[in-house]
Amino acid sequence: ERPVEMIVVKNDGTEVRELLLLDSTRVWLQLGAEITYPKKFPRKHRPVHLSGEAFFDVSHDPSRPFTVSTTAVEIKVLGTRFDVNSAIDGAVTEVALESGSVALHMPEKENESVVMKPGELAVATLSDTSISVAETNPYIYSVWKEKELVFRAQPLGCIMKILERAYGIDIRLGNEILERTVYTGRFKKSLPIEEILTIIEMNTSMRYRINADGSIDIW
């Protein structure tokens, strides 16, 4: 057989990179992420390999499942939207499912798989070959690819997690009542985080402080 020609795309730039695969699947690559896939997908499946973080909007094709493999886990889908992060030295892979359904299995446990539902986060750990699943807000995990931050009556606790991911900053919120306080707003992600926090502060009872190490305390 003729060897399969592979395409390797690495995001060495300073902005999120968007790809359109031949099957109409859309992929957003986070900075430093690398994806490898065949120049032409086989007839029965659509395999890609990921190192780093990416968001997938997979085109629906029941006859050819789409699979994303990382060092820790393989994710099998038919058509769905989800975020995969294997950036943490490859030994841990996080999968946040926005819509559709995916099945995860680890190479060491070929006959065991975990099926995810929308609104869940799965964490696959290579060291003990385990997959844990918990409920989450998938937007927290895919916000890095958006140009705008949109909050619709969301609790401040969730908003701060989104801002942490979007800006790569440690935010500590030590007030349980404030965590549950809902806020609605829309911000361009090009805005400095101080501007966003100041606007939220003006419309809620929240106060914030930026520390010398860049972390932020909320009370």
PLM-predicted stretches and their roles:
Residues 1-219:
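A residue-level detector for the "anchor" residue at the start of short, highly conserved motifs
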